[in-house]
Amino acid sequence: VVFTNEKIMKSKGIKNLLIDLGGVLINLDRERCIENFKKIGFQNIEEKFCTHQLDGIFLQQEKGLITPAEFRDGIREMMGKMVSDKQIDAAWNSFLVDIPTYKLDLLLKLREKYVVYLLSNTNDIHWKWVCKNAFPYRTFKVEDYFEKTYLSYEMKMAKPEPEIFKAVTEDAGIDPK
């Protein structure tokens, strides 16, 4: 995570920070996720789980257009195999690694001087895992790091669509200069 010098930020009148989750705060392991899906029988996962952009059922889930149950059913259908919700969730959540404690400490420090928001393309399954496993640190939990969280699956839109940024800035009362 690269943060601009604090004096420069203050001199430019920066009061609000909009932070991303995936690949910025939380470490990701796409290969581990693919391997774990293969272990449960999803052999052509690479074709469905694109490197640069999610599409199909993965994007639908990220935009909250389908429920976690519908996502799991879609995975089973693509696999042509019955596997449990628990197996699918474990494989899917293996994409997520951790949030290093230095980043959590930095978020807490930033909260002292800035209004910090989270804007993330994520889904219900991943968000529950992150809240339970990645954000808890010392006595802190996700609510302690951010003024508000904006999650693609709740907002029914995803980055880089301009609409999501407009919705966030309007809701938060931020002037995006």
Give the location of each predicted region.
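N-terminal amphipathic/basic-hydrophobic helices that include classical n-h-c signal peptides
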Residues: 1-8
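Short amphipathic alpha-helix with an adjacent loop that forms part of the alpha/beta core around
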Residues: 9-10, 170
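N-terminal helical cap/lid subdomain that shapes the substrate entry/recognition surface
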Residues: 11-101, 105, 112, 123-129, ...
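Surface-exposed alpha-helical segments enriched in charged/polar residues
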Residues: 105-108, 170
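Substrate-recognition "cap/lid" segment bordering the active-site pocket of phosphatases
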Residues: 124-177
